[in-house]
């Protein structure tokens, strides 16, 4: 891998973007970044607080800036927020500046992986499954639109998925 290429992980909440991203970056000797963690570092507050104070629109503005900044780097693995693909600008940034990998998972797996996570503002409702289904309807076609590679994450360890990504990318 002479040229340091960026790898951008997209997919729904609970697909494993952050965990798989860390493994992938380590295996490829690349820098790992997580857009949500970067937002928290820049604001000095957690995502739930940003949502409470600025609303989803404020959060999405911050997310767009973070992804624009990070995607300028070379040789990174970036785990993006699940909703980032709803922005055409972000989709364009990701497509133009690296390889986009869509980590696909089922609603059942999303529910299982996110049910105890209180840091996901969109899921703090009576019926998180309904929210996840609604988001999937909107976002899944967008993930597919920009994906260079699609990898299913259900019932596989993060390390196995990272290896599959490396294999599919020919690294």
Curated annotation (Swiss-Prot):
Matches recorded under Gene3D superfamilies: P-loop containing nucleotide triphosphate hydrolases
EC number: 2.7.1.71
UniProt keyword Nucleotide-binding, yes or no: yes
Cofactor note: Binds 1 Mg(2+) ion per subunit.
Cofactor: Mg(2+)
Family annotation (CDD domains): SK
Catalytic activity: shikimate + ATP = 3-phosphoshikimate + ADP + H(+)
Binding-site residues, ATP: 14-19, 120, 156
EC primary class: transferase
Residues at which Mg(2+) binds: 18
Example of a GO biological process term: amino acid biosynthetic process
GO CC aspect terms: cytosol
Alphabetical keyword list: Amino-acid biosynthesis, Aromatic amino acid biosynthesis, ATP-binding, Cytoplasm, Kinase, Magnesium, Metal-binding, Nucleotide-binding, Transferase
Binding site for substrate: 36, 60, 82, 139
Pathway membership: Metabolic intermediate biosynthesis; chorismate biosynthesis; chorismate from D-erythrose 4-phosphate and phosphoenolpyruvate: step 5/7
Localization terms from the record: Cytoplasm
Top-level division of the source organism's lineage: Bacteria
Molecular function, one GO term: magnesium ion binding
Keyword flag Cytoplasm: yes
Disulfide-bonded cysteines: none
Pfam families: SKI
Subunit structure of this chain's protein: Monomer.
Family, per entry: Belongs to the shikimate kinase family.
Function: Catalyzes the specific phosphorylation of the 3-hydroxyl group of shikimic acid using ATP as a cosubstrate.
Protein name: Shikimate kinase
Organism: Shewanella oneidensis (strain ATCC 700550 / JCM 31522 / CIP 106686 / LMG 19005 / NCIMB 14063 / MR-1)
């Amino acid at each position: 891998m002479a040229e340091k290429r960026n790898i951008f992980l997209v997919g729904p909440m609970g697909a494993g973007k952050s965990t798989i991203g860390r493994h992938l970056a380590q295996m490829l000797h690349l820098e790992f970044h997580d857009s949500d963690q970067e937002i928290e570092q820049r604001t000095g507050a957690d995502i739930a607080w940003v949502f409470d104070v600025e609303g989803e629109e404020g959060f999405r503005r911050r997310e767009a800036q973070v992804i624009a900044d990070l995607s300028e780097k070379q040789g990174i693995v970036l785990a993006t927020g699940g909703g980032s693909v709803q922005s055409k600008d972000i989709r364009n940034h990701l497509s133009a500046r690296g390889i986009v990998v869509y980590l696909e998972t089922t609603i059942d797996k999303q529910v299982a992986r996110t049910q105890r996570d209180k840091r996901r503002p969109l899921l703090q409702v009576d019926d998180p499954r309904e929210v996840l289904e609604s988001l999937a309807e909107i976002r899944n076609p967008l993930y597919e639109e920009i994906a260079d590679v699609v990898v299913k994450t259900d019932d596989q360890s993060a390390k196995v998925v990272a290896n599959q990504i490396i294999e599919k990318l020919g690294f």
